[in-house]
């Protein structure tokens, strides 16, 4: 095994979105250290925290079009019926919604819950209420992604929160996504909502811990053989 492989297998990868922030914290730590030694160590603690925040571990994703996989790490905070945001053009009838709340200690990379093509990406400005509140779905700043999957259209909504003031989505309209593929992140904790077609059966409960790219949120009830997975 090479030195590069050893380092890769020992340390959790850091997402490129974090590089400027990590470098900034480190430079500020050095500058503060010139003024007073204890300030350097305080700065280094913050730098390490920033590295931890932007960690991007590999995930083993089930490659099955009949499954809907969690787009975020965190706690399942809502399972039930809700009207999807108007910008998704999914109609005004309630759909099954599964919400995953991310705290400041969660991995903040968001992954596609299904394989499919992005129909649209719409950003909406708004408030920064506690993302655990139900009204955050309609009142908070959000980024809505509509995906045409093998089983129909699925809405994925990144919602800003009380601390999270920055939603990042690097995927665009007409992009093809693989299930479990990274498509964005929300800095410093928030929530991701998934709006499911009526024939999907939810497989999680409120309070359950979800892992992005691995936890099955729902399925379509089709009999399956041996699972096929992808590590990414």
UniProtKB/Swiss-Prot annotation:
Q: Which GO terms describe its biological process?
A: phosphatidylethanolamine biosynthetic process
**Co-factor(s):** pyruvate
Q: Which residues carry this modification: Pyruvic acid (Ser)?
A: 190
- Give the record's cofactor note, including how many are bound: Binds 1 pyruvoyl group covalently per subunit.
- Cellular location(s): Cell membrane
- Give EC number(s), comma-separated: 4.1.1.65
Q: Extract the Pfam families matched here.
A: PS_Dcarbxylase (PF02666)
Cross-referenced HAMAP family, in alphabetical order?
A: PS_decarb_PSD_A (MF_00664)
Q: Which UniProt keywords apply?
A: Cell membrane, Decarboxylase, Lipid biosynthesis, Lipid metabolism, Lyase, Membrane, Phospholipid biosynthesis, Phospholipid metabolism, Pyruvate, Zymogen
Is Repeat set as a keyword in this record?
no
Q: What does this protein do?
A: Catalyzes the formation of phosphatidylethanolamine (PtdEtn) from phosphatidylserine (PtdSer).
Q: What highest taxon heads this organism's lineage?
A: Bacteria
Pathways involved: Phospholipid metabolism; phosphatidylethanolamine biosynthesis; phosphatidylethanolamine from CDP-diacylglycerol: step 2/2
Its cellular-component GO annotations read:
plasma membrane
**Lineage of the native species?**
Bacteria, Pseudomonadati, Pseudomonadota, Alphaproteobacteria, Hyphomicrobiales
UniProt similarity note: Belongs to the phosphatidylserine decarboxylase family. PSD-A subfamily.
Q: Where is the active site?
A: 190 (schiff-base intermediate with substrate)
Subunit (UniProt): Heterodimer of a large membrane-associated beta subunit and a small pyruvoyl-containing alpha subunit.
Give a short account of its post-translational modification: Is synthesized initially as an inactive proenzyme. Formation of the active enzyme involves a self-maturation process in which the active site pyruvoyl group is generated from an internal serine residue via an autocatalytic post-translational modification. Two non-identical subunits are generated from the proenzyme in this reaction, and the pyruvate is formed at the N-terminus of the alpha chain, which is derived from the carboxyl end of the proenzyme.
Query: Any idea what this protein is called?
Result: Phosphatidylserine decarboxylase proenzyme
């Amino acid at each position: 095994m090479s030195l590069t492989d050893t380092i890769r297998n020992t340390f959790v990868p850091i997402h490129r979105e974090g590089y400027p922030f990590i470098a900034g914290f480190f430079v500020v730590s050095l500058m503060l250290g010139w003024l007073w030694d204890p300030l350097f160590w305080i700065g280094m603690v913050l730098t390490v925290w920033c590295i931890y925040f932007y960690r991007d571990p590999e995930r083993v994703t089930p490659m099955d079009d009949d499954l809907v996989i969690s787009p975020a790490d965190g706690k399942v905070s809502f399972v039930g019926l809700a009207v999807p945001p108007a910008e998704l053009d999914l109609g005004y009838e309630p759909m099954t919604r599964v919400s995953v709340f991310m705290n400041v200690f969660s991995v903040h990379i968001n992954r596609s819950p299904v394989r499919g093509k992005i129909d649209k990406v719409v950003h909406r400005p708004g408030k920064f209420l506690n993302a655990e509140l139900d009204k955050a779905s309609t009142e908070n700043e959000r980024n809505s992604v509509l995906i045409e999957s093998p089983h129909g259209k699925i809405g994925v909504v990144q919602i800003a929160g009380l601390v999270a003031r920055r939603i990042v989505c690097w995927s665009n309209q007409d992009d093809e996504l693989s299930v479990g593929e990274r498509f964005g992140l929300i800095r410093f904790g928030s929530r991701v909502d998934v709006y499911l077609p009526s024939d999907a059966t939810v497989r999680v409960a409120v309070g359950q811990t979800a892992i992005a790219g691995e936890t099955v949120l729902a399925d379509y009830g089709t009999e399956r053989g041996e699972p096929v997975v992808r590590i990414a």
